[in-house]
Amino acid sequence: MVDQIGRDGELIHDVDTRLSNGRKDDLLLTALPGAVVETFAGERVVRYRDQIILKKQITHLGNPWPAFKKRIQIPKRWLTVEARARAEGLVVRFVGIYNYRDVTIFVDFDPSTYVLRKANNSAAHVATNDLHQAQVVGQFSRVDRNGNHLTSVRDDELSRYLLGGVAPEDPRLEVFRRFNAELLDGCEIAALEAVQDMHAAGWPDRFQAEWPGFYLEYRFDAFVRAGSMLHLVEFQKDKRRGRYDFDLVFRSRLSVDYYGDLKASDIVKHESPGNDADDIRRCVEEYGRFWYVIYEHTTKHSRDNGDVATIAWNEWRRSVGHKGRKEFDPLSYARKFKESVRFQRMMILEVNAANFEVVLGSFRQGQQPDGAERALKVMINKRYIDNFLIYTEPEPIRLV
């Protein structure tokens, strides 16, 4: 069984389908009034105005790959067609066709990566979430982990898309784009400088040992407040009764559209701890989606530099009146304390009904002091990012 998408964007487990060449042509001709089938540079294509459409069916990669991984095969002869069309001033599209029952989605793969590859066949990949997004919102564009650009388009939107009618972007993405311009500046952030900034602002978690995540929260909260952006995104530090216990509230005017969580993660880690699985599931069921906004950083540990930063941090906490539960120890948290971090990359991951079970690998996080098991948590597995990636910055470098 593989992932399939239903009419409302829901996930269905079923066998893969197979389309004949004639059926693929019919699906394109139905979506593009005025298009014709013709032969161009020896290849059967669909011609739509000044555009040459080369098409393949989107299918699952096969075992042992996860059910969400899909692709089209790009034959080497497409490169000849692309070169000829470009020489004649025509636009070439490498299009994948997904069809399941009454759902048809087209995926436009930017040819620029694939024309540079020397192999006889290349694979262009797409994930279940790309299909879900297109079915729900009409058009969805992203850059995958290898730097490839792809746009998924519902069948009733294809003509508008090919003629330049791009769907408007979610305005909340611009909030993060502007924040990234400040945070992802390549500068190293020293621990003592960060905690002193939080202390000056009265930030509640200024004394916490895992300071990078709390510093990220502090910076983002200050940014959206200073920029009067709370009507789009609010950082929810003080959780209120009756509301979900998540960091981010995404709004449309006074109403809540959905929730999210803001996380800092070491760039070398393959996974990032998430939230209670039941809470995420309820949130997705109520609002349709949940966003994880992850900022990855490189790390310098104090233990690799004589614990100087650890001692300075502990001394500073004592100097401003902080009293721990144990007797003062200048080497408290020495094994894990981060001397500095450099935020280098951010990504927005969407959890929804089509990827909930795959995007998050569940795990049990030990036991309570009384021996009872802790609530089931979720783990963000970075290997599966392409099945829930909404936005990333900076864009990955293309692999040729």
Language model region names:
Residues D247-R251:
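Short glycine-biased active-site loop of nucleotidyltransferases that positions the nucleotide triphosphate
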Residues V2-Y244, L254-Y258, A264-V400:
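Nucleic-acid endonuclease domains
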